[in-house]
Amino acid sequence: MAILEATNIHKSYGTKLNKQEVLKGIDIRVEKGEFVSIMGASGSGKTTLLNVLSSIDKLSNGSIKIEGSEMTRLKEKELAQFRKKHLGFIFQEYNLLDTLTVKENILLPLSITKIPRKAADEKFKQVATELGIYEIKDKYPNEISGGQKQRASAARAFIHEPSIIFADEPTGALDSKSASDLLGKLQQLNEKLRATIVMVTHDPVAASYCSRVIFIKDGQIYTQLHKGDESRQTFFKDIMKTQGVLGGVQNDH
């Protein structure tokens, strides 16, 4: 079942006289339970694509359906409600509230639902245990490491069981061990909960944890790689080869 269907996605910036087309007719379909990475050189449009797919930014033309709902037809208020219920986000900057504990931060998405306290606590325990942060639940963000902050941010994205999670360079601010810890946990949650994840990354190691990698070049899909039954190491080598053909991938914000 397709969770995300994007058809003929166009995104332009500027005026008619000085228009820059960043996305040029992209089609993407993401099935339930897929862990998909979007890669591309700096300026290729990968971050713009994630922002448009996740409704952070408006598209110029095309169709985006999530769980069958046409995102482009939703009014601002409806879109905000849809986003709260169906979408989860993991950003590079963690975005945790300093005045709340780790547990309180993670439970934020449930505070807008009518879920009973006991059920919320059970959900919290499950996801926090999976991500290895249950023991630090009563600490504040300034008392924990960057890797722990990002795992708390990931737990907050998973807690309300969204239809799809969008991750923008989630390992960008982490050292290699913290990054591999986070990616391993995301992979586990993807497999255990059949969570659907779309992640933008410039890092081939991060992309190798995914089941499919979409390469963007000049605002269009250049090619795709499927992991299939390959080992992560073999998939990593395939990603590196494709990246080499693309001419290297720099960090892109």
Swiss-Prot record:
Superkingdom of the organism of origin: Bacteria
Keywords for this protein: Antibiotic resistance, ATP-binding, Nucleotide-binding, Transport
UniProt cross-references to InterPro entries, sorted A to Z: AAA+_ATPase, ABC_transporter-like_ATP-bd, MacB-like_ATP-bd, P-loop_NTPase
Claim: Transport is one of the keywords in the record: yes
One of the protein's GO biological processes: response to antibiotic
CDD domains: ABC_MJ0796_LolCDE_FtsE (cd03255)
Pfam families (UniProt xref): ABC_tran
Gene3D superfamilies referenced in this protein's UniProt entry, alphabetically: P-loop containing nucleotide triphosphate hydrolases (3.40.50.300)
Similarity field: Belongs to the ABC transporter superfamily.
Function comment: Part of the ABC transporter complex BceAB (TC 3.A.1.123.5) involved in bacitracin export. Responsible for energy coupling to the transport system.
Protein name in the entry: Bacitracin export ATP-binding protein BceA
Species of provenance: Halalkalibacterium halodurans (strain ATCC BAA-125 / DSM 18197 / FERM 7344 / JCM 9153 / C-125)
Gene: bceA
